[in-house]
């Protein structure tokens, strides 16, 4: 098995998939960012804390060092988590699609 050929095929196919879904990926990322900023503003966090918290929440890591206390912020947190799961799912699906393509089309 030639890993170099598979790797190149995977990267080309993955890049193609990202290019095709870029508007959706960008929209999800902006949604996470803007909703995180809204939560941060409501909670009195700095811009950096808001951005940090929104991406920690979107990736479902959730360290717990920052947490929303207001009801509206908590509802937005659920929405951010949903957007993050959707974004992660799309990226994983693209990776699986690209890997499957690379394995099927690379000789050897």
Where are these regions (language model features)?
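Membrane-interacting alpha-helical segments
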Residues: 4-15, 19, 48, 52-59, ...
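Outer-pore turret/helix-boundary of cation channels
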Residues: 22-55, 67-73
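Pore domain of cation channels
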Residues: 49-107
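Pore-domain transmembrane helices of cation channels
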Residues: 1-41, 86-102, 107
